[in-house]
Amino acid sequence: CMMFAVIASWISPAWLVALEGQPWAGLSQPVRGFSIWLGTFCLSLLIYFMTMHNHMGILYYPWQYFTAICPPYWEHFAETVSANFHVAWIMCCTVVVWFMEGIWERFPFTMIKTPWLRRLALFFGIIAISWALCMFFWYMQELVWGDAIRGHRRDAAPDWRWLHVGETAIFFLVPALFLQFYCGNWPNRFSTPINVLVRSLLVTLGGIAIYCLYYKYA
């Protein structure tokens, strides 16, 4: 359930932010809401089977070769058979959606005037930015804590590291939401690129502070 919820937490807001609620944006409620909910459910279910289901197949002995890809296809890249690898980049997607709607004001994708091109560029742009963040946080952990060791437990284990890549992304979401909801998305007096840059710097500093406090005392 948690893994499915992680996917839905990305797809549901992305459908409104990136795809602008299309193709049901012109419908009245509750038809529009139910249609987007159903679309979110179906797409999340498809992504679940592509990313998380194989993890379920290795939880049993012997591995469930007839119901899932065993070992999972991401094993060699992620250095683990755990679906925490997918949890990591999908959690980053959720965070980037909120960044895009809040502190970034969908910039620079708002400069694309063709509606269908803007929506697709924003949707896949969120995924691309999320992958970049995911890889950055992974290598940041290796710089701080050393290389991940497959078979190790706790903070040196690759599956633990991937999970905490997603959690690190959440650390940066906290100051972004604070800035958006409690500070009126400050600053607003400059041009959009300058506003976005200043907000991003503030969120970066806030995220680093939370990261340091969490791993020092948690």
Language model segments and positions:
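Alpha-helical transmembrane segments of polytopic membrane proteins
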Residues: 1-8, 34-35, 45-49, 68-95, ...
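Transmembrane alpha-helices
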Residues: 6-12, 129, 206
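Cytoplasmic membrane-interface regions of multi-pass membrane proteins
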Residues: 8-35, 61, 94-121, 143-148, ...
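Transmembrane alpha-helical segments of multi-pass membrane proteins
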Residues: 28-46, 115-133, 192-209
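Membrane-helix interface motif
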Residues: 46-69, 132-150, 209-218
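Intrinsically disordered, low-complexity segments enriched in Gly and acidic/Ser/Thr residues
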Residues: 151-218
